[in-house]
Amino acid sequence: PLIRDFEVCRSAIIEMEYSHMTKSISHIGDFIEQTSKRNKGCVIQNVLSVSNSQGFIQQSEQFENRIVASDNTSNYKIVEKNDFAFNPARINVGSIARLTTFEKGIVSPMYICFRAKDNLYPEYLDYYFESKHFFTEIQKRLEGSVRQCLSFDGLCNIPLCVPTVKIQQRIGKRLSALVQEIKLEFDFLGLLQKQKRFLLYQMFI
């Protein structure tokens, strides 16, 4: 129940903080820039994917027992810490993320990559991508008859209300604190479950 309460609280704060987006006269494109630096010479070997539930993960974790990346990754795009990437064909199910767990990595050329400009706190944008408003705006901008995709221009046209950097940081830190609390509770629950299994095992030895 405690974990669920934290998650409900986090979702409620996100919706409250970003509920004024319909009044915005700015757009995401005013605050981000696209990146497309390639992995020339195949220097970076850390191949990443974007999961709709886990964010950036190593491709080997997402596709166990399968080699998905090409032997030649020179055309793969480089992502650095706090960069964002999304799969144009899967953003409608949440496949968009900010890189936080690695300093650098590479992603398939199909991904669209971008980063926040100096006047936008990356965490503020990151949490906006979890809001109902963002997913509503995505649906209006999907293109394609067979497989609907969101282009970078489509992303840039989405309204975004951006307060001062100080307020952005306050919102980001507030939500990050809740995320950390949820993680700690999940970790504690995992330890309790291990302890339970151990005790049950000892009972039947």
Predicted regions and their residues:
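Short amphipathic coiled-coil heptad-repeat segments
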Residues: 1-24, 187-205
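Non-catalytic DNA-recognition/assembly elements of restriction-modification systems
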Residues: 4-41, 157, 161, 165-166
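Glutamine-centric residue-chemistry signal
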Residues: 11, 59, 135, 147-148, ...
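DNA target-recognition domains and sequence-specific DNA-contacting regions of bacterial/archaeal
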Residues: 29-162
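Extended amphipathic alpha-helical segments enriched in small hydrophobics
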Residues: 164-189
